[in-house]
From Swiss-Prot:
Catalytic activity: RNA(n) + a ribonucleoside 5'-triphosphate = RNA(n+1) + diphosphate
InterPro entries assigned: DNA-dir_RpoC_beta_prime, DNA-dir_RpoC_beta_prime_bact, RNA_pol_asu, RNA_pol_N, RNA_pol_Rpb1_1, RNA_pol_Rpb1_3, RNA_pol_Rpb1_3_sf, RNA_pol_Rpb1_4
Function as written in the Swiss-Prot or TrEMBL entry: DNA-dependent RNA polymerase catalyzes the transcription of DNA into RNA using the four ribonucleoside triphosphates as substrates.
Binding annotation for Zn(2+) 2: C814, C888, C895, C898
Organism: Pseudomonas aeruginosa (strain ATCC 15692 / DSM 22644 / CIP 104116 / JCM 14847 / LMG 12228 / 1C / PRS 101 / PAO1)
Cofactor: binding details: Binds 1 Mg(2+) ion per subunit. Binds 2 Zn(2+) ions per subunit.
Protein name: DNA-directed RNA polymerase subunit beta'
Sites where the protein binds Zn(2+) 1: C70, C72, C85, C88
Amino acid sequence: MKDLLNLLKNQGQIEEFDAIRIGLASPEMIRSWSFGEVKKPETINYRTFKPERDGLFCAKIFGPVKDYECLCGKYKRLKHRGVICEKCGVEVALAKVRRERMGHIELASPVAHIWFLKSLPSRIGLLLDMTLRDIERVLYFESYVVIDPGMTTLEKGQLLNDEQYFEALEEFGDDFDARMGAEAVHELLNAIDLEHEIGRLREEIPQTNSETKIKKLSKRLKLMEAFQGSGNKPEWMVLTVLPVLPPDLRPLVPLDGGRFATSDLNDLYRRVINRNNRLKRLLDLAAPDIIVRNEKRMLQEAVDALLDNGRRGRAITGSNKRPLKSLADMIKGKQGRFRQNLLGKRVDYSGRSVITVGPTLRLHQCGLPKKMALELFKPFIFGKLEGRGMATTIKAAKKMVERELPEVWDVLAEVIREHPVLLNRAPTLHRLGIQAFEPVLIEGKAIQLHPLVCAAYNADFDGDQMAVHVPLTLEAQLEARALMMSTNNILSPANGEPIIVPSQDVVMGLYYMTREAINAKGEGMAFADLQEVDRAYRSGQASLHARVKVRINEKIKGEDGQLTANTRIVDTTVGRALLFQVVPAGLPFDVVNQSMKKKAISKLINHCYRVVGLKDTVIFADQLMYTGFAYSTISGVSIGVNDFVIPDEKARIINAATDEVKEIESQYASGLVTQGEKYNKVIDLWSKANDEVSKAMMANLSKEKVVDREGKEVDQESFNSMYMMADSGARGSAAQIRQLAGMRGLMAKPDGSIIETPITANFREGLNVLQYFISTHGARKGLADTALKTANSGYLTRRLVDVAQDLVVTEIDCGTEHGLLMSPHIEGGDVVEPLGERVLGRVIARDVFKPGSDEVIVPAGTLIDEKWVDFLEVMSVDEVVVRSPITCETRHGICAMCYGRDLARGHRVNIGEAVGVIAAQSIGEPGTQLTMRTFHIGGAASRTSAADNVQVKNGGTIRLHNLKHVVRADGALVAVSRSGELAVADDFGRERERYKLPYGAVISVKEGDKVDPGAIVAKWDPHTHPIVTEVDGTVAFVGMEEGITVKRQTDELTGLTNIEVMDPKDRPAAGKDIRPAVKLIDAAGKDLLLPGTDVPAQYFLPANALVNLTDGAKVSIGDVVARIPQETSKTRDITGGLPRVADLFEARRPKEPSILAEISGTISFGKETKGKRRLVITPNDGSDPYEELIPKWRHLNVFEGEQVNRGEVISDGPSNPHDILRLLGVSSLAKYIVNEIQDVYRLQGVKINDKHIETILRQMLRKVEVSESGDSSFIKGDQVELTQVLEENEQLGTEDKFPAKYERVLLGITKASLSTESFISAASFQETTRVLTEAAVTGKRDFLRGLKENVVVGRLIPAGTGLAYHSERKRQRDLGKPQRVSASEAEAALTEALNSSGN
């Protein structure tokens, strides 16, 4: 018995380990794993079904087929355990050993391992310094390779074909050694002296000048050092022994009908064994060379197919023409070992069913069908029945449950009480996709779900299914209750706003009950308290919308958290008074004294949570839901065709627009405007008309005429059903109503260009055939987009999770001083995001001073909450430096202070929170809502007409930012810089709005001027780009020869002539390299200079520029010399939506990126080359100038002699994030990427907190490139983890050596995931083969720091409750280890001990 217990004990033992190392296996190692050699290709005997001896399923090698029973049956039972049968040679043991015992095949000739050969870059090729092509020719027996040249003129590693080989043989006899096949490669690898080679390479690298050569050499050096450091030997990349997988992992299962299903691996192994045996026989027979060679080649191919079928040549196919699944295929891809079995497993104690509404449930409950519960909780029920003595054995209990006896239901109810279950809806896009509920037993077969959690699950009841899981252990139940209960997840982790927000019917009901109507029944009544209102309403004395006076007893929670009672009389409506009955104590009446739209309800719940806490908010949310359902039923809102009221002005607006379009058409016909201008104008026109129609329609819908108590006719807000739905936010939007009752508007073609003819009809009037046909474009594109979008969005989330999975909060404070500068995000005239919203929940990095003084009002280290936000607003603070994940200095992980508030909990983030995964989910989850392109509403194109002026919204003081301008004769300013901005500041000096001013804008105000709201302060022509003079003078044309560089156009109507610069492509040969220009001269004919420089005032004209002046005309400052027509707007396909987000996270370089100045200095142009201009920037401090060749077609924003600062835009275009990082630093990059990504999400109305994007950015900035190696072990140009460089530099600092210098590098998320320190995480993400090959060669260790690695090896993850477990284990390990002390410390301790004992 004792033995049995010991045996069982051994089985359950888990191995403790801290890291996993992967390496190459030596032949000795493979033999040591093996339990015997597989010599025959046979599997099992077809008559007896017993495994053949020495075959692929041999029991002698791999173990017995039945537990404790040898093959011939001589020894049976446990008592013979460990005996080896003398007849059949099988050891008596558990049959389970067939899953773990390996065999081996002794190969008659060495075989190269295909992974190290073909996985790029080829490791074997790098080591031998041969190309992959050459090595393959040797391996597959096409050429000889010289192994030992002896005293001949040949070189080691030289390739010889047959002729050359035989010539060499005749010439030198056997002074040299040249062979072919894997043996030759094995010999060459064996002969490498790593020490010597590494020394040689280290000397060679500093002496080479060519970049490519250095790259190649450092690659080789890295690989050699990896081999040297890891203890792998190069010759192990060529196999002489092949391991054989345990048979139970490649099973052979009998099907009915006498056939067998087998794993593909058996076929592949069989091929190898057959060819190997044949080769042995041929070698014994001393067969002719050519035959042996062919056989060796076939053996190499067979082993290739076994390891990675299809990597070289055609994949070997089975009987049914599909390629066989090799060992490599087993682990990679979605169906591979990593993703199918290690990262996600199917679990027991789970079930799934359709969901339906449970409007009567409480928030923490879900309805669970009895049948399901009975099955899920079976073991618990058996235990209870037995414990109660109702059943004597488990078998009896099982019978009772199967018969469904009445006492079983009682026991079930008891078991389920207080036992939470987890509900999950696929796709689980964020952590709220799994929540815990207390089950309530219900009849029927569908799970009932509380309506308020639908938003979190993104569930609806049109046939969605959900899965139920039972947490078994006490700890699991505890976590489910404390962390995952739906009542604990009121706020969304993405933005910190409530996610338990009523929608649709509930909103409709609450909105309906809080609306007011003029002259409703009971208007003007006064009530003593809420109960009286209730009675009046129920008895029909007062209508729900009647305006009444009510005496309210409200309890208000003060700053100190105490409730103070307050009684007052308020003007309100009956419905609002009724709603106040469910509002928890502590909130004032004003929160419900308004019509409750969706936004207001969300605000109310948020406010409630912050004021009265979690418990009351949950109860309140439930009450709101019940109330909302009740009153939406009472309201009886429905939609009929008559609700779509078409505005009377529609016809007038459309006729006016049509006339204008005709006018533009005639201008085009007479050549006044170009095709592009016509197109732009027409589209602007219709966009405007559409807006007017929808304004008229909304105005029309939102008001209705009623008679008040005095008998006068007055306007009141309409009770039109459709208007109420849209207005309350229950369903529908203005854009949709516009299509129903206004006009459908402009449509886009599939390629994104807008069709000029709009659809003037709406759905109520109905569409004609042409209009219907135009509509189909958008509708179909919408459907196609949706299908693509879902897949793309899921893939984006997967990449994000993978890059950020190991980012966990590991300490409270990293002590950094750095942070990001936050200011309100102002776009156009609007403050898109005020400062308060951006800093809420962040920690201040540097003291905030009162504007205009040096009094500290917020000390560094303060966590900004709602109260502080209000305070900053009151103190009119404009910018704050906050801690950020990007600047956090924690080595592994991130610190709580840099992260700030845990958005889903509302307090500082806990240690152990997996902030990386939360960030990834928060960004990925709304991905499906992002369109693929940005401009669709059912195909209706939304394009605002191009801005041509700045009209300020608020009054205030004008501020001009980095605006270069000249003053025109009439006193107006003309902008001559591109980065100029105009801002309006209020009386406190806070910026309220900010606008970009394009080049050539005419500005009618000056710095410091006061303006009134609505004033137009700047104007420009949006369709052309002017060139403005900066001095007075006379025009002189340079290189403007008619018919060669320019062509003259005369307008028939006006008789004016324009000169148009020809495109270099269309010019005759003589004009190709001439650059037409306009220069300014004085009366004496001397060149005028630009003010403040010694550069002549000369303006080069790009292709298609139009000049209206004649040679010799007089111009004054600020005049326009030439116009460049701007391109038509093809809804300037800003890659919208999802692709844009993916591009930013992948850090892709845009096609034609903007060109930034590399250094600060003065611009000049050097000698031109064919098709390119040479731009030279000369620094003002006299250091070396910087040169860059720029294609001639790029339109430059700078003129000769202009001063630029490092990082300024020289030529417009989409920004390249890598340039921003290199020239402007990390914080500018962070600002750019955060704003760009937020713009995409904001367009869709999705709110995501900045810190999630910053968290991902931190992971993208993990790597640095070594620019100078100093005394470190890094090589210049190496990409290494920032933490590695910092650690090594610290080490070097203590030894007074030179540290390495480095530049930060931005990696895209895919690349960053693949270059993580953990090879398990990288291999389970993508490119499994490549990752594992690289890891094996370098002998990598995975310290299992991230979440993914720990899931794969089946441990608790080092986050959340698992972090405590991991740190405890680490502490235990450290206790076991002796502490390391330096010699000096030991000496000091010793002397101290001696001294003290001496006393």
